[in-house]
């Protein structure tokens, strides 16, 4: 039998039935699921130093285990000395098994390394069932060697779900193990 990530097994065995019971779904296909996780990182100083983009791409690749791509500007912004087509950030989109593996590492090893961590805020939902989480330091991930970090910077992590409402999405992510703060 092929390898399946722990969280994917847990989703199939426990989370689906819990969400069906909570929201009264009649069909398994109605149950919301995690579609993709997008990690993105803006590098504003890359206008003057091109190597910063390479560092950002390299760090996102180490964190996720999948090659990150650099993002480019769509238009000129004179006040930032930015031209159309210049690299300004990095992003990586995780789907399938890599997505579940990353979520497992985020929950079990990265988030507990955050200083004074008491759970994540539930204010990051967008009204359509997606959740945005901001990470202030990339060094919370065990894949990043603190001694080799060029500059401490954060990133945005977006959880895209098939849920129609924020309540469904929050229940899904909480069942998968994301530690939300108690109100």
UniProtKB/Swiss-Prot annotation:
Belongs to the universal ribosomal protein uL5 family. Pfam families: Ribosomal_L5, Ribosomal_L5_C. One of its GO terms (molecular function) is structural constituent of ribosome. GO terms for cellular component: ribonucleoprotein complex; ribosome. The gene is rplE. This is Large ribosomal subunit protein uL5. It comes from the Bacteria. Keywords: Ribonucleoprotein, Ribosomal protein, RNA-binding, rRNA-binding, tRNA-binding. Part of the 50S ribosomal subunit; part of the 5S rRNA/L5/L18/L25 subcomplex. Contacts the 5S rRNA and the P site tRNA. Forms a bridge to the 30S subunit in the 70S ribosome. This is one of the proteins that bind and probably mediate the attachment of the 5S RNA into the large ribosomal subunit, where it forms part of the central protuberance. In the 70S ribosome it contacts protein S13 of the 30S subunit (bridge B1b), connecting the 2 subunits; this bridge is implicated in subunit movement. Contacts the P site tRNA; the 5S rRNA and some of its associated proteins might help stabilize positioning of ribosome-bound tRNAs. Coiled coil: none annotated. Gene3D superfamilies: 3.30.1440.10. GO terms for biological process: translation.
